[in-house]
């Protein structure tokens, strides 16, 4: 059947998004470009099948091949992260975190998590999120001078508040996280440790960031971002009793039927992550980020939070350009460079404006951008921020963006049919 003829309105919307992805330089740190294999797996007939339960223990018949798919995803994840137990069913990272909390603490218990403005995530205790509404969260931040995690201050807060659980991990933190120090702090106050490695999972998988699994009671992650899989979540542990709690808190605790077509996409992505090529990909992410950081460091107006990066992302304070994050995001979008406004440590503006933008390299690296390309992209960003009212300059930047995206297509052979 011809999709375009049957539903031209929907077809056009998807085709337009495909073109946007092709023509834009995607720098949102939580986004990536999945492989054709992941697309094929996620668009397969597995979407037709209900499969409540777990492999070998389903509430529906006809799941023998579904079990093969889910076990592939589980086994590959175990191999990637050195975990004894893995649940690949969470529909998202937020749902993975919800099930993890339910497995570790009770409503009203005290939990420590990273402050959202300092780089944490909504599910790490934001008052507008279920986490902040269900549990008593105490936030920790970063050092005012270095803008890096201050483990002595985190330990002091832990001694003061005696949390039942400490959450490590971030959504906008550009430095290495020392999970062994978090484990020491948790042990000192008798707390459990949960790590949300959503942003860095792909780097962890290939040894480019310390692995939290040996230190954490429970580790959660998304399966997209640096892991370059479909949008979804996952939970890992080495504790058999916690694994049982996790399974029951995912199903039936927070979800019904798993999305087996998405789990197939996860299995495909995990298979790719086990290859030598994926380690090369991770190394290129780091090199591209470092190259962008060098370019920003040479500009007197550009200020990088924590003065650089150890991973896949950068936080750029744009106030010296006479802009806020919202304005910078909109301005860059005009030349087909996509970033997101982002709060910075000790933020003074609202989350709807912010003082900074977040820049990530996973998606452009998937497209084949190298260090030279990444340096050029950083220069283009600086040119735009410094010339917000010069239409001629902005038009020239847009032309250079087109040259870069034409040279690095998102899918050489794929287009919506």
From Swiss-Prot:
PROSITE patterns: SHMT. The record marks 224 as: Plays an important role in substrate specificity. One of its GO terms (biological process) is tetrahydrofolate interconversion. GO terms for cellular component: cytosol. It is found in: Cytoplasm. InterPro entries: PyrdxlP-dep_Trfase, PyrdxlP-dep_Trfase_major, PyrdxlP-dep_Trfase_small, Ser_HO-MeTrfase, Ser_HO-MeTrfase-like, Ser_HO-MeTrfase_PLP_BS, SHMT-like_dom. Its cofactor is pyridoxal 5'-phosphate. Pathway: One-carbon metabolism; tetrahydrofolate interconversion; Amino-acid biosynthesis; glycine biosynthesis; glycine from L-serine: step 1/1. SUPFAM superfamilies: PLP-dependent transferases. It catalyses: (6R)-5,10-methylene-5,6,7,8-tetrahydrofolate + glycine + H2O = (6S)-5,6,7,8-tetrahydrofolate + L-serine. Keywords: Amino-acid biosynthesis, Cytoplasm, One-carbon metabolism, Pyridoxal phosphate, Transferase. Pfam families: SHMT. One of its GO terms (molecular function) is glycine hydroxymethyltransferase activity. PANTHER family: SERINE HYDROXYMETHYLTRANSFERASE (PTHR11680), SERINE HYDROXYMETHYLTRANSFERASE 1 (PTHR11680:SF35). Catalyzes the reversible interconversion of serine and glycine with tetrahydrofolate (THF) serving as the one-carbon carrier. This reaction serves as the major source of one-carbon groups required for the biosynthesis of purines, thymidylate, methionine, and other important biomolecules. Also exhibits THF-independent aldolase activity toward beta-hydroxyamino acids, producing glycine and aldehydes, via a retro-aldol mechanism. HAMAP family: SHMT. This is Serine hydroxymethyltransferase. It comes from Ligilactobacillus salivarius (strain UCC118). The gene is glyA.
